[in-house]
Amino acid sequence: MNLESLSSFMELSKNFRHKSVLEKRQEIKSFLELSYKDFFYNNANEDFLFNMIENYIGYLSFPIGIVKNLKINGKYYSLPIATEESSVVAALNFAAKILENADLRYSLGEVLGISQIYIKSEKDLSKIFVDLGDKIKTWIEPLLTNMNQRGGGFRRLSTRHIKELGIQKLNIYVDTCDAMGANLLNSIAERVAEFIFLEFGYECVLKVLSNDISEFTAKARFVLDFKHLLPGKEDSWNLAKKIELISSIGFYEEERAVTNNKGIMNGITGVCLATFNDTRALEASVHKFASKSGKYFPLSKFYTTDNALVGEIEIPLQVGTKGGVISFNEASILSFKIMNVNSKSEFIGILSCVGLASNFAALRALAFNGIQKGHMRLHVNKILHLLKTKYNISDFEKDKLLLEMERMNIYSFDFAFKILKKIRLENENKV
């Protein structure tokens, strides 16, 4: 399918949430001009999966939900989120409505991949290696034909001597265009290591990519007028001040910062799972960046001006929109079609905004009426579904269970099952 033939965004209907699963699929299919035969998350190509990993025995199903009409840089996006956590998609949809008038925007500079070679040397070779740029570019040219054609390729190098280990580190920075480029970066490291040995006789003890891209970050920001936070002006100001205070706690308490950043990654990791991006590399780099000062800090901050709540985030995002499994897996291909993303830089920007929106939704809930109210409503739905499937509960029993869970403020399957047994025992005694 030609993505350029799509309109600038896929604006889903206002009542999308209330449609059946089949109706939701049909609406998206009609936007994407997919036929009834086209893949839509509800099956798997096991032949493909078999060849992805060793000892394949099956696949794990994750629910995929849609965040609809999140306005980013003036354009609306519908985003697929793969997650097991009940409230992630609901919270992001809620945030999308509020932030529609907040001018949510991202900005980013270059994003480069890094090949690393660690060379055994008691001597500091920095002066020699810093002048190797042209030679290294020639050495790796055969590997970069496709990247050069797309405007990418070798960009620069850096080096430093680790005296304590007797090791010289060499970093090679490469623009991998729309790919994450893991295989390419590893190949470059191995090729350069071979030439260093042949040219200089130095043993290379390690040659591999780095998953740390903390020097290449995306920034996102919104400015939300108080009037869009809550209906009442005074209430909105108070809520914004609470959000500001909760946000600041993470800068003094690492325990809070960890939880704050987990909330940011809820949305980001969900989109990356839906697109078959490497979530381990992504999160490793993000958390390293959060601790770059020697202390673990929040990736985001929220503060107030005279009439608005401002949210900001800075985050490194190592992802791709092409290459590897991404280009061949049907689920990944469909996810990118739904988003109508045209480049890796656009995808990185979207992810930074998704992280900020996820964080905003969580902080607003914490400041307003606690995180459990919305989350538990969805969690209870799961419990009731399981009870319906296993024990065929009636509508009467369902209502009684809901009342009792709310009264006791206990939302667990074990507690619900205990109450169900009590209800049924009471009914038996009445008969």
From Swiss-Prot:
Similarity remark: Belongs to the HMG-CoA reductase family.
Active site: E85, D278, H375
Domain of life of the organism encoding this protein: Bacteria
GO BP terms, alphabetized: coenzyme A metabolic process
Matching InterPro entries: HMG_CoA_Rdtase (IPR002202), HMG_CoA_Rdtase_bac-typ (IPR004553), HMG_CoA_Rdtase_cat_sf (IPR023074), HMG_CoA_Rdtase_NAD(P)-bd_sf (IPR009023), HMG_CoA_Rdtase_sub-bd_dom_sf (IPR009029)
Highest classification ranks of the organism: Bacteria, Pseudomonadati, Spirochaetota, Spirochaetia, Spirochaetales
Stated name of the protein: Probable 3-hydroxy-3-methylglutaryl-coenzyme A reductase
Role: Converts HMG-CoA to mevalonate.
One Gene Ontology term of the molecular function aspect: hydroxymethylglutaryl-CoA reductase (NADPH) activity
Residue ranges of coiled coil: none
Annotated organism of origin: Borreliella burgdorferi (strain ATCC 35210 / DSM 4680 / CIP 102532 / B31)
